[in-house]
Amino acid sequence: SGILLSVMAVGVQAKPETGSGLDKSLLPQPVYSPEPGLVDLYWAAWDLAWGRVKHQDGIPQSPYMDENLWDDTIWIWDTEFMVLFCRYAPSLFPGIQSLDNFYKTILDGEPVSLKIWHPDNPPFFAWVEYEYYKMTGDKRRLEYVLEDNRYLQRHFYWFEKLKRGSSRFSKMPVMLERREKGYLWGDVQSGMDNTPRGRGCNGEMLW
């Protein structure tokens, strides 16, 4: 038997205060009596996530989900994945809102006190926005990214025109290069550095 999740319909615009306790009644409640230790692990994972809701001055969206590595840095790749679990508790975790720190910085030119470590990380924005919508039914969010600001469309064209070696958003240079049959990419920038395919490819992996 698997873990049964009772997903609750909750609001999507709350701004949690990290100093308060995590209200676990607003989270999916797992039922898995054969292995209660796995349920404990589940709750421990949410506690860890709650500890990464961060408030910071000088950024477009605060609070946001922090990756727990460097306080002055955010990653597209990691934030996209965090959105996928934050969608189960949108009233508690600012997952989808955290994407605005990339949209507004890269596309709108808003000042930010954070570095975007690899701006050429895989752009799964459309995928995670859609998965968030399927879970929450938040049509206003879709209007915001697709119609009001056209963030997804604009990011596609921005990504296609990236120049290898540029380093506008952090000291880490872009490794992406558009080729006729795909992208020439680096192992770390593509997110494939811990896979047999990507390990040690040093910017010469063709997608």
Predicted regions and their residues:
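N-terminal signal peptide c-region/cleavage motif recognized by signal peptidases
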Residues: A9-G11
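Low-complexity, Ser/Thr/Pro/Gly-enriched N-terminal "stalk/linker" regions
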Residues: K15-I74
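The feature captures the catalytic groove of carbohydrate-active enzymes
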Residues: G109-D120, Y157-W207
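Short glycine/serine- and small hydrophobic-enriched flexible loop segments
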Residues: L84-Y88, W127-K134
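Inter-helical turn/loop segments and adjacent helix faces that build the functional surface
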Residues: Y132-E143
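Long, well-ordered core segments of solenoidal/helical folds
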Residues: A45-D57, P90-V112, V145-S167
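Bacterial N-terminal signal peptides
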Residues: S1-V7
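Alpha-helical support elements that line or immediately flank enzyme active sites
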Residues: D72-F102
